UniProtKB/Swiss-Prot annotation:
Family affiliation: Belongs to the IF-3 family.
GO MF annotation terms: ribosome binding; translation initiation factor activity
InterPro entries linked to this entry: T_IF-3_C_sf, T_IF-3_N_sf, Translation_initiation_fac3_CS, Translation_initiation_fac_3, Translation_initiation_fac_3_C, Translation_initiation_fac_3_N
Keywords: Cytoplasm, Initiation factor, Protein biosynthesis
Keyword match Nuclease: no
Subunit structure: Monomer.
Species whose genome carries this gene: Campylobacter lari (strain RM2100 / D67 / ATCC BAA-1060)
Keyword Oxidoreductase among UniProt keywords: no
Function: IF-3 binds to the 30S ribosomal subunit and shifts the equilibrium between 70S ribosomes and their 50S and 30S subunits in favor of the free subunits, thus enhancing the availability of 30S subunits on which protein synthesis initiation begins.
Protein name stated in the entry: Translation initiation factor IF-3
Annotated gene: infC
Any GO CC annotation of this UniProt entry: cytosol
Any Gene Ontology biological process: ribosome disassembly
Subcellular localization, as worded in the UniProt entry: Cytoplasm
Length: 173
């Protein structure tokens, strides 16, 4: 069973009186549901309840198959417009050499140019847990290297055994 609410069609409509609208926008006014069903059958279309909460309920005479197709088409378009955020993670340690930092920053800048978010994670081992400031200092050093091409989304923050910082590509003006 689908998640969307079911739409009442033709004989499923139990209301005595309904407000009826034609496929072309013509307003039939408040008529009995039987009369609206007769009009829909004469036109070879369906009677679809579009506003069951209204008093009286609002029904429209239309081609239900075409209506469903249009709804699915709108949903597909909306889904296409959604942007999936891709986060790349770069792991570091407190005792990383400068050359390795340069290499990791180069990769991070490539990811940022592709429009991806980059999460830097500094792993704290053993006694390093006692001074997470070293991890924060390393992330601040990295931030100075990427600040011209990125915005800092999340400040360096200790989470468990990691010090994390999230950077995002700069917004184009």
């Amino acid at each position: 069973m689908s998640k969307e609410k079911e739409v009442l069609l033709n004989d499923e409509i139990q209301a005595d009186e309904i407000r009826c609208i034609g496929d072309d926008g013509k307003v039939y006014g408040i008529i009995s549901s039987d009369e609206a069903l007769d009009i829909a059958n004469r036109l070879g279309l369906d009677l679809v309840m579009i506003a069951p909460e209204a008093k009286p309920p609002v029904c429209k005479i239309m081609d239900y198959g075409k209506f469903r197709y249009q709804q699915e088409k709108k949903q597909k378009e909306a889904k296409k417009k959604q942007k999936v955020i891709d986060i790349k993670e770069i792991k570091l340690s407190v005792k990383i050499a400068q050359n390795d930092i340069n290499y990791k920053v180069k990769h991070a800048s490539e990811f940022l140019e592709q429009g991806k978010h980059v999460k830097f994670r500094v792993f704290l081992k053993g006694r390093e847990m006692g001074s997470p400031e070293a991890g924060v200092a390393l992330l601040e050093k990295i931030w100075q290297m990427v600040e011209d091409i990125a915005d800092r989304d999340k400040e360096p923050l200790l989470e468990g055994r990691y010090v994390n910082m999230l950077v995002t590509p700069k917004k184009k003006k």
